[in-house]
UniProtKB/Swiss-Prot annotation:
A molecular function (GO) term: transcription coregulator activity
Start and end residues of each stretch annotated as Disordered: 28-48
Record's protein name: Mediator of RNA polymerase II transcription subunit 14
Keyword entries, A-Z: Activator, Nucleus, Transcription, Transcription regulation
GO cellular component, one term: mediator complex
Function (record text): Component of the Mediator complex, a coactivator involved in the regulated transcription of nearly all RNA polymerase II-dependent genes. Mediator functions as a bridge to convey information from gene-specific regulatory proteins to the basal RNA polymerase II transcription machinery. Mediator is recruited to promoters by direct interactions with regulatory proteins and serves as a scaffold for the assembly of a functional preinitiation complex with RNA polymerase II and the general transcription factors.
Quaternary organization: Component of the Mediator complex.
């Protein structure tokens, strides 16, 4: 296919050499491409000389050479056909391969479905029809596309039939152009030759004049000089002449000539007047005549701006002639107008040349310079998208009606500045009319433009809370002359800085980040926004990325575990986070935290914030499968507006941050627990629980009244609870850090006791390691170590109630004279008031209700029933006689509403009786020890039975209330048949006990009564009577005599008395213990004693009998 011969300089180097460059002698006699192609079939071409006779061959050599054949841009038509055919073949193979693979898949499905019982289903037939339609459509599209290609080849083939003529036409055109070039070159050389021959021309010789000169020796045609040169003037004469001219000029300027306002700055000297126009020119004029109407003549002229140069040569002559003509016709006013307009035009021309030179440097693609009449336009940042900016420097008429007139009618150079298609004030641009510099003017305008952009960005960035509150530094440097001095400097984090500059030549925003690797995220160029929006967007993105990278780097260094956002349900995050926080977010976990807690770091221009997020506990993350997304339940912002909490990041600060986040998790889980309960008041409110400066975790203040104690956490004793609280209602919960060994959170709870209890704090803290009391004061502190994310409210309430119960028991003991010597939350060890060797202990046994105790602690709102149901037990040492009534005392403790006070009082009341019974039962005898042995049984704390097995006698000892005193009553409970066997003993009992009165006791019907302090004497007298009777019986049996009823008094009474018994034998009614003294109402006490005695008797009878 023949190509196209391009016309013009871009197609060939010169018109005269086109044929020489593409002339091929070997193929000069052939057609293009070696032959003529008709529909793709080439035929051998015939030379024009074929068929001629040999006689004509010689004549052909005299013909001019054939035209040079042009082959530029030609290529064979068969190559194009081969290429199209090959491409069609390749595309067809690809299409068949694709359809074959799809057909194999469809055939496999068809074979499987055909094996079924009913054959191919209708659904499959529909799918197969669709597949076949798609294949046919693809084949049709392929054939259409290929057909279009071959149609193009057909058109080219038909056109190639006339290619021979077109090729010849191209050769003729090239030949004509070559000849035209030769003709023009010949004319050019002839013209140059004619001009050069002017110098070689010589005039014809003047023979007549030459002969006259040779003969006469002179020339008559040459006349001599008719004037004489003046004599040289003396210096004094010159001075006098110049002074005269000065006076003449002064008089003319003062009296006759009109001096325009612009030429009022002049001075006369040296016979001339010098007019000075600042920033424009300085001109010297003088006069040639004394006449007032004589004109001024130009003496000298000088420009007062730089760069400038006076006209030289012919141009200077033209200027001088024009100035003198103007002085003659228009005077000084016309001269000023001429020179003023000339200077203005000259200045614009100088600035234009400077701008053109500047545009040919590195400003070439970003500066457009145009000159319209006398207005110079400099458009800078021409390739920057958005509004255009340019400077116009032109001549202003100076008319008073103009808005920018200076008050005079003199024209002047005016600078107008258009910034982003809007005209703005150009008063701040450095437009120096003395030192002309297009670069300085351009740099000044660009500096002010950059300052405007950066100031707008500065104001936009400073509106963010991160910078307006002083969390990070932001500053700006501005200049009206140098664009490089205009930049915006800000802190992205404590360790990274950002300098924002605008490139002066192109207007592109340049961000210089330290450290520099962060700039790899600044790849997005927003072309549809203004410069300010672009800067704010890029700075916001870089600042957030910088903060995220820095936090992630240090978090990984200290062992935090980052969590990918893809593992968390995005919808759940959208529900609990604001939209601004979702753009830049990092999720972390710590090994010491519960799986349901996360820490989230968000970065924005308003500040960097830390959040704690609680996941849904129904599906703990540790048990989820790898594909299940985590569900965020609630989020808590813990940093608030304070952004300078961490300072410069390093590993130590992140270790402190881990502790602070753990503390905030503890605070939040405790607050959530308190909100679930709803009965405990706390301060501050949840919205104010934020991290404080220096990573201080806020404390929680509780107000826990005894009456408002949550019912589900109240420990209710079956035998009653303290009626008042011994602990102040205000508590403070403070987080103290992480235990390095266990990884548990350390939480301290501070409180105060309501009253001072002697030695309570020292004894309690001695046995409990995680509690401490003030040495001199009522304050105490409780230490808790729990996993991070586990609330301490439930254990705290349990501890407080335990402490309150212990304080209640201790106060009750002290009121009864008992002395505690060891305290713990579950046991109190005490000693008796008078006999220190007798000791006991009261223990508290707490049992949880149900098997879901831990779930109730985590979800207290699911139940309103008390979780803990404690019981109180009492124990005594081996030497203590109260060990026999342990069961009875325990029953009273857990069944009576005032069980503790009643038990302590019973211990004091029963002590003399039990000591005496223990001693009489522990007596040892040498002879017939079994006859004298006495036994007693404690059926309850108020009922005892003394037995003498040898005689089969029984005496019941019971406590009862008489008026306001507790008395012991001894009654004979021996059956009648046994009594009838010992009439003398009955007689003795009647005389010495029933109808008698002893030391602190007196007899009643079939018994005796004694106060609690004197019951030991009554029991001892009874025992002595029984022992003397048995001794008498033993002696009578040895002699064979009947039994005598005379008693024996051979024993000392003092050895059986208890240590605190009064030996004088008087009944001390004033010191007798009373229940009314402790509780104030004797009837109520009697009733309670009887109810307790009945309950204890039933229990003891079952246990013993």
């Amino acid at each position: 296919m023949p190509g196209l011969a391009m016309d013009g300089p871009s197609a060939m180097a010169s018109r005269a050499t086109v044929a020489d460059m593409h002339y091929d002698p070997a193929s000069a006699s052939q057609q293009a491409n070696g032959g003529i192609y008709r529909n793709g079939i080439g035929k051998k071409s015939h030379s024009p000389v074929d068929g001629l006779h040999d006689s004509h061959i010689g004549c052909l050599h005299e013909l001019p050479p054939e035209l040079s054949h042009i082959t530029l841009g030609f290529f064979p038509f068969n190559n194009l056909i081969s290429r199209v055919v090959q491409q069609s073949w390749n595309d067809l193979n690809e299409l068949l391969n694709e359809m074959g693979s799809s057909q194999a898949y469809q055939t496999g499905i068809s074979s499987q479905l055909s094996a079924t019982k009913n054959g191919m289903s209708e659904k499959f037939r529909g799918d197969q029809a669709t597949e076949n339609s798609l294949k046919k459509l693809r084949i049709l599209e392929f054939t259409h596309s290929r057909r279009a290609e071959f149609i193009k080849l057909l058109v080219l083939s038909q056109w190639s039939r006339q290619a021979n003529e077109v090729s010849r036409l191209i050769d003729i055109q090239a030949f004509i152009r070559m000849r035209s070039g030769f003709y023009e070159a010949a004319l050019f050389h002839i013209g140059n030759m004619k001009q050069n021959l002017i110098v070689a021309q010589l005039a014809n010789p003047d023979l007549k004049t030459a002969s006259h000169v040779l003969s006469a020796g002179k020339i008559d045609a040459l006349h001599g000089l008719e004037f004489l040169s003046p004599r040289p003037l003396a210096p004094s004469q010159v001075l006098r002449l110049l002074r005269g001219i000065n006076k003449l000029i002064d008089m003319r300027l003062a009296l006759h000539d009109h001096v325009p306002d612009s030429l009022q700055n002049y001075f006369v000297h040296d016979g001339r007047v010098t007019f000075i126009v600042p920033n424009e020119f300085e001109i010297d004029l003088s006069v040639a005549s004394a006449a007032p109407s004589a004109q001024f003549f130009l003496v000298d002229m000088k420009f007062l701006f730089f760069p400038s140069s006076l006209p030289k040569g012919r141009l200077r002559s033209i200027v001088d002639h024009q100035v003198n003509s103007t002085l003659m016709n228009a005077g000084l006013v016309g001269c000023f107008n001429l020179l003023h307009n000339l200077i203005l035009t000259h200045k614009i021309t100088i600035l234009f040349k400077q701008a053109i030179d500047l545009a040919r440097t590195y400003w070439s693609e970003h500066l457009r310079v145009e000159l319209f009449h006398r207005t110079l336009v400099l458009q800078y940042w021409s390739k920057k998208p958005g509004g255009k900016s340019w400077i116009e420097i032109g001549v202003h008429s100076g008319l008073k009606g103009s808005p920018q007139s200076t008050g005079t009618t003199t024209s002047f150079l005016q600078l107008r500045w258009f910034r982003d298609n809007e005209e703005v004030s150009a008063t701040d641009i450095d437009f120096n009319l003395t030192f002309l510099s297009a670069k300085s003017i351009l740099f000044s305008a660009i500096s002010l433009h950059i300052t405007h952009i950066l100031r707008t960005a500065f104001e936009a960035l400073r509106q963010n809370r991160l910078y307006c509150l002083g969390g990070l530094y932001i500053g700006m440097s501005a200049s009206s002359k140098e664009p490089g001095d205009c930049y915006l400097e800000l802190q992205m984090t404590q360790t990274s800085h950002l300098d924002i500059m605008v490139e002066a030549v192109s207007g592109d925003t340049v961000l210089r980040v330290a450290p520099s690797p962060i700039t790899r995220y600044d790849t997005e160029i927003i072309v549809d926004r203004g410069s300010v929006e672009d800067i704010v967007e890029r700075v916001s993105r870089l600042r957030c990325v910088s903060a995220l990278e820095e936090v992630e780097r240090y978090a990984k260094a200290v062992g935090w575990m980052p969590l990918n956002l893809r593992h968390v349900n995005l919808e759940s995050l959208k529900r609990i986070f604001p939209p601004s926080a979702l753009r830049s977010m990092l999720l972390f976990r710590a090994k010491c935290w519960e799986p349901s807690w996360l820490a989230v770091f968000t970065s924005a221009m308003d500040g960097d914030n830390w959040w704690i997020v609680q996941l849904q506990t129904q599906n703990p993350p540790a048990l989820q499968s790898h594909w299940r997304l985590l569900e965020a339940q609630r989020a808590k912002l813990i940093t608030g507006w304070f952004t300078g909490w961490l300072g410069r990041l390093h590993n130590a600060s992140f270790s402190s941050l881990l502790s602070a986040l753990s503390g905030m998790i503890m605070v939040q889980c405790n607050v959530d627990f308190l909100n679930e309960i709803g009965a405990i008041h706390f301060f501050p409110p949840p919205k104010d629980l934020l991290l404080q400066p220096c990573l201080r975790v806020p404390s929680i203040y509780l107000r826990l009244r005894h009456d408002d104690f949550p019912s589900q956490f109240r420990t209710i004793f079956s035998g009653g609870s303290p009626r008042r609280s011994f602990i102040d209602e205000t508590f403070r919960i403070s987080y103290k850090g992480i235990d390095q060994q266990s990884g548990h959170a350390i939480t301290m709870v501070y409180g105060r006791l309501m009253t001072d209890i002697d030695m309570f704090g020292a004894l309690y803290a001695k046995s409990v390691q995680d509690i401490a009391f003030q040495p001199k004061g009522r304050g105490f502190a409780i230490l808790f170590r729990t996993p991070v994310g586990t609330p301490i409210i439930a254990p705290l309430l349990e501890r407080l109630q335990q402490m309150n119960n212990i304080a209640f028991v201790v106060e009750s003991m002290k009121s009864q004279g008992f002395q505690p010597h060891s305290l713990s939350p579950l046991r109190i060890k005490f000693s008796y008031p008078t006999q220190g060797e007798l000791r006991g202990s009261i223990k508290f046994i707490y049992h949880d209700q149900g098997s879901h105790f831990e779930s109730k602690l985590l979800f207290p709102a699911t139940t309103t029933k008390p979780i803990l149901h404690p019981r109180i037990g009492i124990d005594f040492n081996y030497q203590n006689p109260h060990r026999r009534i342990t069961e009875s005392l325990s029953t009273i403790l857990n069944s009576h509403k005032d069980g503790m006070s009643l038990v302590l009082e019973l211990i004091n009341i029963t002590l003399p009786l039990l000591v005496t019974l223990e001693r009489i039962c522990a007596e040892e005898y040498i002879d017939n020890a079994w006859c004298f042995r006495a036994q007693y049984t404690a059926r309850s704390a108020r009922l005892y039975q003394i037995r003498y097995p040898f005689l089969r006698y029984r005496f019941n000892v019971s406590a009862s209330q008489r008026k306001s005193y507790v008395v012991w009553v001894i009654q004979n409970s021996t059956p009648g048949p046994e009594r009838s066997k010992h009439p003398s003993l009955e007689l003795r009992l009647k005389d010495q006990i029933y109808n008698s009165q002893g030391d602190g006791w007196r007899g009643i019907n079939q018994g005796a009564m004694a106060y609690s302090a004197n019951v030991s004497r009554l029991v001892f007298d009874l025992h002595q009577l029984m022992k003397s009777y048995i001794s008498q019986m033993a002696k009578s049996n040895q002699r064979g005599e009947p039994t005598d009823s005379s008693p024996s008094a051979g024993c000392e009474f003092g050895r059986y008395l208890p240590k605190n018994e009064n030996k004088k034998g008087h009944i001390q009614t004033t010191t007798a213990p009373t229940l009314e003294h402790a509780y104030g109402n004797s009837n109520m006490v009697v009733q309670s004693v009887r109810q307790g005695e009945a309950a204890a008797r039933d229990v003891d009878v079952i246990a013993i009998d």
